[in-house]
Each structure stands twice: as C-alpha cells, then as structure tokens.
UniProtKB/Swiss-Prot annotation:
This is Adenylosuccinate synthetase. Pfam families: Adenylsucc_synt. Its main location: cytoplasm. The lineage of its organism: Bacteria, Pseudomonadati, Pseudomonadota, Gammaproteobacteria, Alteromonadales. NCBIfam families: PRK01117.1, purA. Its EC number is 6.3.4.4. The gene is purA.
Length: 432
C-alpha cells in the first residue's frame, strides 16, 4: 500500500534532511516543500558531487520525482530562477519536474531590505535571520497585504497592489530605519518579467496531491529548518517565521493530516544551532570545537559557524510530542568517532532545584536552567561509511539504544557519512 511520509528536522535545523530526502526519493513519486523559503539549506552529496538547494525540493535530482512547492512556502522569484539555472546547467530539467502553488506568497526586494534593516537595528541582540526577507514576507501574508504568485498573472491589478504595499514599506524603510527606499518601477518590471515562467509551473497543489494519493502514488513532504525553530513551539522569539512541525503539512500543502502514514524525525547524534537563542547543551570547550571541525558545521545557506553541543534528549521529547514521530534518522554518528566519553542531556535543573524532562516554552526561561547529563563511553573505532548495523562499534550501538530509550522512538535510519550510500536503513519509511 502506498505511503505518505513526512521528513522533518527535530532540532534547530541543519540535521541532514537533504541527504535523507534524496535517499528516500527512490521510492517517491512526489516530493513537497510546505513551509519556509530559500532560508533553508539542504546539502546533497551524490557520488562525491555536492549540491546545495535552498528552495527547490531535494527530490529534483531524481528523474522519477515531481517536486512541489506548496502554498506555505514564501517564494523569491529571483532565488527560484537562480537555483533553476544552476540545476539546468547540470542537465536537470527543472521546468518539467517542478510544480508551484499560485497561493505562495512572494518575497520581493523590499522584504529583503526590511529584514536587513531590522537585524541591524537590533544591535547586539539580533534574531539571527538569514536576511533573505522570509519573516517580512510572512508578515505581509498574515496582514493580508501580501502579493502571491497568482497575482502576477493579472499585471494591471498586480501593479496597483504592489504600489500600495511598497508605499507602506518604503515609509518604514526611510522614516524609521533611515535607509534608501526600494524602486517601484524596477520591482514591478522584475516581477512581471518572471510571470510567464512561473505560470507554466503553477498547479492546484491540493488537488494534485489528493489525486496522487488516490492513485496510490508515494508522497514525501520535506520540512525545512527544525522543530525547535517553529514559530509557535520553538525557542521564541529566536525562531523562524513558519510552522516547521508536522502541522505545517496540512496548512502549507493542503494535505489532510489523516492521510499521513509515517513521520521521520531527522536528528544529529549531537546538537547544533546557527545564530542567537538558547542552547542548553552548548559546548565552548575543545570537544565543541572538535564537533564543529569534524562535522563541517557551517550553515549551508549563510556559511555561518554553527554552535555545537551534546545530544539533548529533553528537547527531543518535545519534538516527539509535537510531531508524533514514528521513527528517527540519526545523522553524523561518525563525527563522534574518537571521543572517549559522550554526554546526553536527560533533564533540565531549574532554579528551585527541581529537574524536569520537558523544556520551557519561552527563551527567557532557558536562562534559569542547567542541563543534567548522563555519561556514556565513547568509541575509538571508525564508523564512517558503515552500511551494516552489525559493523558499528559496540559502544556506538549502546549509544543508539540509549537514545531510543530516552526518546521512546526507534532509530530506523543511521547516517554514517554525507553520501547517500553511507547509510544504514533498518526500517524504510515507505515499507513499514
């Protein structure tokens, strides 16, 4: 029987979702993005060749897959064309494989300028956005003044709507942030220039996916960022502007939640975070540097150095609660090779001395907690590139088993390297 599978991050993003999606798409007919924008960075390594995608779903490299960008994604025409050109230069027929919802909010130049101006105005307390206009575009959507892909197909009305929203934002840019206004004429011309290109890819996403489900096609939903960056459930306000959790599938792709069969949570064997915000298990010592260097922990989108820390089972419990995770994919296990001792956070100690196994909701509350650790022996053997579970070091197996016990969820896939072939699949999400 056909399966509909969600693949999402369970930490602060950068868990390795791109590789896993690419690995699993050999059995998928559709791969769907349902939230975020080109602030995501999904890195694929296939036969040693590296590809970084920010907006287009990771399944685009598969001939058998139709990729879909749902209404929950904020779409930058400029970013889409740039990414499409990069792929087409490598022989990938993007226009044949990609479909887009006409309800996608557009990211336009003034959104980018607002994003940059706001981060600068925050001084030494930035949110840590990518500066790509994601948040301002979602704000316009919620405020019901945003322009959508479908608006481009009526140039006269689009010009009027653009003038109104640009006057509003230019007032803020010039009077409050004291920066230059964005040109109406150039913004209009650039936007309308891509209208026909986008129109050729526009479909009714909800209807397409529903028909696919009824035909028995396999559908995969590809999340961006991670659970702990969710606008509602993350470490607010140090979060992204969309719902990165499983609920985003229903709202961002118009796909009924009762039709989802399996939720695969991608989780690193340790923890990383880019930008500002709480990070209870963060390491400022040599071990943290080791994880960062060996794990190549630099953001695929911004190039920023990622903060590193131990595995946080408390945060993962929340991710399991929110997402109804069926199974985990544990990534970057090989980065732990050579460490004598490993630590796992099993609780948060509060100021009153109590220890809780669930995280607080607000970022400020994290300042009052101390992580409680459980130590485990590390391993000196090499796990890099291992493709059979029995060939893993025994201490690595013990570590995996303990993570399963603490989260209450089985680890169905283990990634031991960046290439799609450097993987141990214990249970395939499309086959369970």
């Amino acid at each position: 029987m056909a399966k509909n599978v969600v693949v999402l991050g369970t930490q602060w993003g950068d868990e390795g979702k791109g590789k896993v999606v690419d690995l699993l798409t050999d059995k998928a007919t559709y791969v769907v993005r349902y939230q975020g924008g080109h602030n995501a960075g999904h890195t694929l390594v296939i036969d040693g060749e590296k590809t970084v995608l920010h907006l287009i779903p990771s399944g685009i490299l598969r001939e058998n897959v139709t990729c879909v960008i749902g209404n929950g994604v904020v779409l930058s025409p400029e970013a889409l064309l740039k990414e499409s050109a990069m792929l087409e230069e490598r022989g990938v027929p993007v226009k044949e494989r990609l479909r887009i919802s006409e309800a996608c909010p557009l990211i336009l130049p003034f959104h980018v300028e607002l994003d940059l101006a706001r981060e600068k105005a925050r001084g030494d307390k930035p949110i840590g956005t990518t500066g790509r206009g994601i948040g301002p575009a979602y704000e316009d959507k919620v405020s019901r003044r945003g322009l959508r892909v479908g608006d481009l197909f009526n140039p006269t009305d689009f010009a009027v709507k653009l003038k109104e929203v640009l006057e509003y934002h230019n007032f803020m840019l010039t009077n409050y942030y004291k920066v230059e206004p964005v040109s109406y004429e150039k913004t209009l011309a650039d936007a309308l220039a891509v209208a026909d290109i986008l129109k050729a890819m526009v479909v009714d996403v909800t209807d397409v996916l529903d028909r696919a489900r009824k035909r028995g096609d396999e559908i995969m939903f590809e999340g961006a960022q991670g659970t702990l960056l969710d606008i509602d459930h993350g470490t607010y306000p140090y979060v992204t502007s969309s719902n990165t959790t499983v609920g985003g599938v229903a709202t961002g792709a118009g796909f009924g939640p009762l039709h989802l069969d399996y939720v695969l949570g991608i989780v690193k064997a340790y923890t990383t975070r880019v930008g500002s915000g709480p990070f209870p298990t963060e390491l400022g010592c040599d071990v943290g540097q080791h994880l960062g260097i060996k794990g190549h922990e630099f953001g695929a989108t911004t190039g920023r150095k990622r903060r590193t820390g131990w595995f946080d089972a408390v945060a993962m419990k929340r991710a399991v609660q929110i997402n109804s995770i069926t199974g985990f994919c544990l990534t970057k296990l090989d980065v732990l090779d050579g460490l004598e001792t490993l630590s796992i956070c099993t609780g948060y100690k509060h100021a009153d001395g109590t220890v809780k196994d669930v995280p607080p909701m607000a970022a400020d509350d994290y300042e009052l907690i101390t992580p409680v650790y459980e130590e485990m022996p590390g391993w000196s053997e090499n796990s890099f590139g291992v493709t059979e579970y029995d060939n893993l070091p025994q201490a690595a197996k013990n570590y995996i088993k303990r993570l399963e016990e603490l989260t209450g969820v089985p680890i169905d896939i283990i990634s031991t390297g960046p290439d799609r072939n450097e993987t141990i699949v214990l249970r395939h999400p499309f086959e369970v």
